[in-house]
Design a protein with these regions (language model features):
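Conserved protein kinase catalytic-loop anchor
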Residues: 154
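Hydrophobic residues within beta-strands of alpha/beta enzymes
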Residues: 10, 157-159
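Acidic/aromatic-lined carbohydrate-recognition and catalytic surfaces
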Residues: 1-147, 151, 164-215
């Protein structure tokens, strides 16, 4: 049917394992398909059938944050774990967040973790912890995710809220707003994306498109 319509590419929104707090944009495993949608074998068959009809497959990559159910975040709850640095943690008091930034879903962008006595950043739901792109190991792991799907025949990636991946490292108070000017189109966003392009997107021939949250034309 899609072939007869002249469709030559299909963009699939997140189908990864997820608690579904945000319609799958809270990813708990980047390389596993939620049983609700099927299996990796089903995906491979989809790719095979699509390519036989000249239809390319584009996947949604949610790389600004993960679900707090992701194995990385579960490990990060231990302050001594190397995964602690996969996320953005800051000191504060139980009732006093590190700054006044607001979540796009309402309320503070910081959630207190009592056991480790620090806050973690979540620009969206509290169940969506922001990844620390300043950590090269995080970037390396995300490249592996892209490679995994490229190996399965994916042709392109749609990068969710990709212009939020670089935050002002000072994490200053925003005296005139909700903080978005300090994390939108941040200081290293272009650098990070150039690195991904050099190391993965170009070598694998992946088409990419980025969602630019809070960016005006």
């Amino acid at each position: 049917y899609l072939h007869k319509l002249g469709v030559d590419a299909i963009w699939l929104t997140p189908f990864y394992v997820s608690p579904q707090v945000d319609n799958g944009y809270d990813v708990a495993n980047y390389t596993a398909i939620d049983p609700t949608y099927g299996t990796l074998d089903d995906f491979d068959e989809l790719v095979t059938q699509a390519k036989s009809r000249g239809i390319r497959i584009i996947l949604d990559m949610v790389f600004n944050h993960t679900s707090t159910q992701h194995a990385w975040f579960r490990e990060a709850l231990n302050k001594e774990s190397p995964y602690r640095q996969f996320y953005i943690w800051r000191d504060g008091e139980p009732e006093t967040p590190p700054n006044n930034w607001r979540s796009k879903f309402g309320g503070s962008a910081w959630r207190w973790h009592a056991e480790s006595e620090q806050y973690y950043l979540h620009l969206f739901a509290p169940e969506q912890a922001d990844l620390n792109w300043e950590n090269p190991t995080v970037r390396a792991e995300l490249k592996k995710v892209c490679e995994f799907w490229a190996d399965r025949g994916v042709d392109g990636l749609r990068m969710d809220v990709v212009n939020l991946i670089s935050k002002d490292p000072r994490f200053p108070e925003d005296l005139d707003g909700d903080g978005r000017r300090f994390y939108t189109d941040g200081p290293r966003a272009h650098e990070f994306l150039h690195e991904m392009t050099r190391d993965v997107f170009t070598p694998r021939g992946l088409m990419t498109v980025g969602e630019m949250s809070s960016t005006s034309l």
